[in-house]
């Protein structure tokens, strides 16, 4: 199976909203919620993709020859590659009933673990979403990151208990999720969090806590103040606020603000290839999350589809490193890329 096969297979079963496009750039699905689309006019997801494309890589092969080492150390673990599958919940709502949250997470979490990376898992108004996600992580010996929505504190405590029982190595919260149209005025309630509220949640985790949905230096410093081990520079793929800047536009300043603090910086939004992963690392990220294409990979090929996509990313990353003179992840530097 190759990636073209994965896309072709996915188009047969992924549902009416996602088109399993050859290039997942947000154009065909904009303003499709339910579905994978972005909010409002839908141009934030498109901008995310386009801004990575605007960054070019600087080739330099006047260096020692060698096989690039793509390993990275994060959250007390060693990963084969510096990228992770992003969180998705309620797949039968946003895609199709070919998969339930249980079967989707079982495939994704296990396939990612077997390939040397980890999957972040989703949450939703239906409590079964988190239950199924944490069961899948438990079945994979804790190799996954449950991602909790910013509910009221009582609901967070319940879901945090499930997360910890899974043996996960870290817990995340997508703090921007209160902007999701399908969470507005729902029960349980979700909303923004103060630094004090976030600090209380961080303590509940009792393991590295990742704040997902940071788009400003100010927000990054608040997450640091609350005790976060890492942040994810993210606008939720354009799904929570229309007319946002792209993550590639704000990543460098946020990474610079957190440099030397010990807080790790991850980024998502429109990253589709191993070359994009390289660009993100060059701009200061410690790691990358990729979401929508992993959904396509599961629907298009199950565990084999996930492995196919991971291998594709890994090959592209290693090739770019080799052609730019970086023999390890730590050797990827800002001067290896240039903005248009």
Where are the regions that the model predicts?
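Conserved active-site-proximal phosphate/metal-binding subdomains
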Residues: 1-27, 219, 238-261, 271-340
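An N-cap/entry alpha-helix motif that binds or orients negatively charged groups
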Residues: 2-80, 332
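Structural signal for hydrophobic packing residues in well-ordered secondary-structure cores
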Residues: 49-59, 112, 116, 164-167, ...
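Outer membrane beta-barrel
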Residues: 80-89
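N-terminal binding-site loop/beta-alpha segment at the start of enzyme catalytic domains
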Residues: 90-98
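Short glycine-enriched loops at secondary-structure junctions
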Residues: 90-91, 123-128, 176
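Alpha/beta enzyme core
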Residues: 99, 109-110, 138-139, 151-267, ...
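A gly/proline- and charged-residue-enriched helix-loop-helix capping module
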Residues: 103-152
């Amino acid at each position: 199976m190759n990636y073209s096969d994965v896309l072709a297979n996915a188009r047969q079963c992924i549902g009416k909203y996602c088109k399993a496009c050859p290039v997942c750039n947000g154009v065909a699905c904009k303003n499709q919620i339910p579905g994978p689309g972005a909010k409002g006019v839908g141009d934030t997801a498109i901008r995310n993709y386009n801004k990575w494309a605007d960054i070019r890589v600087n080739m330099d092969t006047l260096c020692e020859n060698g096989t690039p080492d793509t390993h990275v150390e994060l959250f007390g673990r060693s990963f084969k590659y510096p990228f992770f599958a992003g969180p998705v919940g309620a797949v039968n709502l946003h895609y199709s009933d070919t998969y339930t949250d249980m079967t989707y997470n079982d495939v994704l979490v296990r396939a990612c673990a077997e390939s040397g990376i980890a999957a972040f898992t989703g949450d939703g108004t239906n409590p079964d979403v988190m239950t199924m996600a944490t069961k899948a992580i438990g079945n994979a010996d804790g190799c996954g990151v449950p991602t909790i929505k910013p509910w009221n504190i009582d609901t967070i405590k319940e879901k945090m208990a499930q997360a910890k029982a899974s043996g996960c190595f870290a817990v995340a919260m997508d703090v921007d999720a209160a902007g999701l149209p399908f969470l507005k005025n729902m029960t349980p309630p979700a909303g923004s969090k103060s630094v004090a509220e976030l600090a209380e949640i961080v303590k509940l985790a009792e393991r590295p806590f990742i704040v997902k949905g940071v788009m400003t230096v100010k927000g990054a410093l608040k997450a640091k103040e609350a005790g976060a081990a890492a942040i994810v520079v993210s606008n939720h793929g354009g799904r929570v606020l229309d007319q946002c800047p792209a993550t590639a536009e704000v990543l460098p300043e946020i990474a610079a603000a957190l440099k030397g603090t010990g807080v790790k910086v991850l980024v998502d939004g429109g990253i589709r290839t191993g070359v994009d992963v390289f660009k993100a690392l060059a701009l200061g990220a410690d790691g990358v999350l990729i979401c929508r294409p992993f959904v396509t990979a599961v629907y298009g090929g199950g565990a084999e589809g996930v492995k196919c996509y991971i291998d594709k990313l890994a090959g592209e990353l290693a090739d770019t490193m080799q052609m730019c003179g970086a023999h390890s992840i730590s050797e990827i530097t800002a001067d290896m890329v240039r903005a248009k």
